[in-house]
């Protein structure tokens, strides 16, 4: 798989798939990883720790609808070239934690519905997010209804055009840091 540049929809709609061995995939040239695992709603685990995402430009809906995934180790993802992360984790409603602290989103323009319906996430650390190029955050955290803490103090909203439904349904947040001081 080392020469593959487009991995979009590779396992799209594989709704009966319970196990998937992609640990040794060579993703070093992949630019498009959109909808890669979309609708794999029976997968409970997915080992992608070794994925080289350094050339990836789009991750739209990459894990959308992976509703049985209980954990996802993406700590090593290099997201420095990614421009679109919309719906990336949307519908991953069994994930209880997601470590995205190392995500470089400095080139991302669209984060719409990124965590939509991640209804079991309790904490999401987005403090390091450089949102200065982001234009869309529509529904970004909507229906994350178990989320208890969210720190958006470093969010720069100067280029954001649409924030509709951004926090809609986040009914358990008791510590909402930085909402009053979103950078303009």
PLM feature spans:
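Negatively charged
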Residues: 1-184
């Amino acid at each position: 798989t080392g020469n593959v540049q487009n991995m979009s929809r590779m396992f799209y709609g594989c709704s009966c798939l319970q196990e998937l061995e992609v640990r040794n995939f060579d993703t070093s040239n992949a630019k498009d990883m959109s909808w890669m695992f979309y609708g794999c709603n029976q997968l409970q685990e997915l080992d992608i720790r070794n994925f080289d995402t350094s050339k990836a430009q789009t991750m739209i809906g990459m894990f959308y609808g992976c509703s049985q995934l209980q954990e996802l180790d993406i700590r090593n993802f290099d997201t420095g070239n990614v421009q679109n992360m919309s719906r990336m984790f949307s519908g991953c409603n069994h994930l209880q934690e997601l470590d995205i602290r190392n995500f470089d989103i400095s080139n991302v323009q669209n984060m719409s519905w990124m965590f939509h319906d991640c209804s079991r996430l309790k904490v999401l650390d987005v403090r390091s997010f450089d949102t200065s190029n982001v234009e869309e955050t529509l529904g970004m955290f909507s229906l994350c209804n178990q989320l208890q803490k969210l720190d958006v103090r470093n969010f720069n909203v100067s280029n954001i055009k649409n924030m509709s439904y951004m926090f809609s349904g986040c009914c358990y947040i008791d510590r909402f840091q930085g909402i009053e001081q979103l950078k303009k």
